[in-house]
Amino acid sequence: MSDMTNAGNELEPRLITETGLDQRLADIIEPVLIGIGFRLIRVRMLNQNGVTMQVMAERNDGTMTVQDCEEVSMAISPVLDVEDPVDKEYHLEVSSPGIDRPMVRKSDFVRWQGHLVKCETSILIDNRKRFRGKIVEAGVDGFTLERDQVAYGEEQKVTIPFTALSDAKLILTDDLIRDALRADKLAKAEAANQNEADDQE
């Protein structure tokens, strides 16, 4: 995993965004999250437990605790009540992106380089739209996958432009769990050190 953190990238735009009502919700929620030091990952309206508005978010350093979920919920609830974008009752669910997270920013591909991802594209690339493989390189315009399943006649590596991406998600592996836990522990230690330094000033 790359040593790159999400700190300082809070205004980095998302590559994969919502459409329709979900887009309207994201437009309402995202400025509130930025204002309190969080980044929006995804918003979805789901037909589960009645109707559920699922909001995935994280701190700029990539962490998200239960207390953070409560803070986000309390910050966005009043704004949603005022804007009233949903014409029926719904349940608000705020969560972290999880270990097998959606990949929505360029920095996600840098941060999780070396891990397995599955993705879909909006256009054909090497005669396909669905890919699965290890992120071997992430650049400014796209990323390179080393496919773990190659059909006859296909190249092992494929470069996917970020502009062609329609969906991407990490695949849960033991290595991913280990690296995600290590990154979370490091981010929490850095936050504790920063809080300690702030207290001494």
Curated annotation (Swiss-Prot):
It is found in: Cytoplasm. GO terms for biological process: ribosomal small subunit assembly; translation. Keywords: Cytoplasm, Ribosome biogenesis. Pfam families: DUF150_C, RimP_N. GO terms for cellular component: cytosol. Its main location: cytoplasm. Belongs to the RimP family. Required for maturation of 30S ribosomal subunits. PANTHER family: RIBOSOME MATURATION FACTOR RIMP. This is Ribosome maturation factor RimP. It comes from Rhizobium leguminosarum bv. trifolii (strain WSM2304). The lineage of its organism: Bacteria, Pseudomonadati, Pseudomonadota, Alphaproteobacteria, Hyphomicrobiales. The gene is rimP.
